[in-house]
Amino acid sequence: MEQIVCQLLTDPPMPGPVNMAVDEVLLETVTRTGSPILRFYTWSEPTLSLGYFQLFSERERHPESLSCPVVRRATGGGAILHDRELTYSLSWPRRELPPGVDRKATKGSEWMYEWVHQSLIDVLAELGADAQFCKPTAGAEKSFLCFERRSGWDVGLGDVKILGSAQRSYRGGVLQHGSLLLSASPFTPQLAGLSEQGFPLGLDPLT
C-alpha cells in the first residue's frame, strides 16, 4: 500500500465535547486548505459517544454507562464507550484520491475505510497479531453499541471486533474517525480489546 502525506496531530486526553469539536474544526479546515489531516487522541474520562442518528434517550439501553458523560458524534453508526482505546480521525479533501486508488472502482469515500483499516491490519501484523476484515453479521446494526455490530469494513482479531469507523461528508471534505479497543472497559466488560487477545499494547507502538 502506497503512503499518503498528511499533517499529523497527536493530542493529549481531552473531554468529549472538545474532542468532537476539534474533529469538526479539522473537517472544515480541510475544505478550505485541501490538505489532509490525521489526528490521534484519547479521552480525559470514560465517555459515551452517540452516533449522529441515535437519540439521547437511547442511552438507557446501556445502563452500565449512565454515570458517564455523553456526546454526539458528527458521524453515524452505533454508540461507543471511549475508555481504554485509541481514537483517530482523518479529514480528507473529497476531490482528492491517494496514489493507487481508482475513482471508478470505489464508491464515494469508501476507499478511506479500506485504506485506514488495512494500514492498521499491517501494523498489527508486524506486532504479531493476525487481524482481518470482519464478516458482516445480519441484524447486528440494531445493536446500540458500535462494537456489537459488524460490517465488512470493520477489523477483527479472531471473532472479536477491535476497530470500527464512521464517516461524515461536509462540503468539499470527508471526516472519518474510529476507535481501536486496547482493552476491555469496566463499563463494557463484554467487549474485549487487544489486551484480552494477548496483545497488551500501549499507544506508542501504534502511533
What are these regions (language model features)?
Residues 1-61, 69-73, 79, 146, ...:
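Active-site loop/lid in soluble adenylation, ligation, and acyl-transfer enzymes
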Residues 53-54, 93-96, 160, 184-187:
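Short loop segments at secondary-structure junctions
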Residues 56-105:
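A glycine-rich, hydrophobic loop/mini-helix early in the fold
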Residues 84-152:
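Internal, conserved structured core segments that host functional sites
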Residues 117-141, 145, 169-207:
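Long, positively charged amphipathic alpha-helical accessory segments at protein N-termini or as interdomain linkers
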Residues 150-167:
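Aromatic/basic-lined ligand-recognition segments
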